[in-house]
Amino acid sequence: NPVFNEIYQKISNDKETVGVEYQSKLDGDSLLKLLSFNKKRDVFLQRTSVGIHKDDLLFTLEENPLKKYASQGQRKSFLLAIKLAQFTFLKNCLGINPILLLDDIFDKLDPYRVQSLINHLITNFRGQIFISDTHNHRIPGMLSDLGVSHLHKEIIDGKWKK
């Protein structure tokens, strides 16, 4: 998806390439043929052993499987890029800006990736964005430095701090 790739590139500062590949287990055979071939086995097992439910998505980083080769920060960047691509898709389909919730974005991301993410959001997203953080002044400081209008609220023991 070009939108996903573009977002990931911005978060990673064009340092890494990513991909998503659909992997079918049908191996060129028709679904009907595979279901017929496996019918006795499936009845015995009481489950369907072939079909699109066995297909998968392979996520890659620099053409290597993301699960095996990516750091936690790269995995979180990948996940954020997918979420932001979904946001863009919904915005384009519905014609409205969905509310975006980013929970603890500093967890697993280095400050450069967070800065790139915030810059991307400022440039490309309109609407309400809720960002949570475990450090009280980190996000407000970053947003203030960028001249971004924001409302900062602190919750202590489950209650808004006044």
Per-segment meaning from a language model:
Residues 1-99, 108, 112, 116-128, ...:
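Conserved NTPase motor "head" modules and their coupling/switch loops across ABC/AAA+ ATPases, GTPases
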